[in-house]
Amino acid sequence: MVKNLFISVISQEETKENRGSVEFQIFNFTNKIQRLTSHLKLHKKDYLSQKGLRKILGKRQRLLAYLSKKNKVRYKELIEKLDIRETKTH
């Protein structure tokens, strides 16, 4: 697994200040999701990792929904930077 392929949208100075921000949490979950998907491509029967991936996907989806309700502009910018598909809303 190559760690250099992961997204580095947030600079080091910003990560020290904003570790609790919604954007940083979504960014962190996105990196974890990318690592787990690359792991699951090699280990297809690793069901515990699949369960962990589904949990992280749910957490990220809830945070994205929260961010879209609170601030649409920041939500759109983050989705573009992280190359995430927009969630379907009812």
Swiss-Prot record:
SMART domains associated with the record: Ribosomal_S15 (SM01387)
CC terms in the record's Gene Ontology section: chloroplast; ribonucleoprotein complex; ribosome
Biological process according to GO: translation
Main localization (coarse): plastid
Cited Pfam families: Ribosomal_S15
Compartment(s): Plastid, Chloroplast
Superkingdom per UniProt: Eukaryota
Entry-linked CDD domains: Ribosomal_S15p_S13e
Signal peptide (UniProt feature, chain positions): none
Keyword field: Chloroplast, Plastid, Ribonucleoprotein, Ribosomal protein
InterPro entries (UniProt xref): Ribosomal_uS15 (IPR000589), Ribosomal_uS15_bac-type (IPR005290), uS15_NS1_RNA-bd_sf (IPR009068)
GO terms for MF: structural constituent of ribosome
Subunit-level organization: Part of the 30S ribosomal subunit.
Family label: Belongs to the universal ribosomal protein uS15 family.
PANTHER family: RIBOSOMAL PROTEIN S15, BACTERIAL AND ORGANELLAR, SMALL RIBOSOMAL SUBUNIT PROTEIN US15M
Protein name (record): Small ribosomal subunit protein uS15c
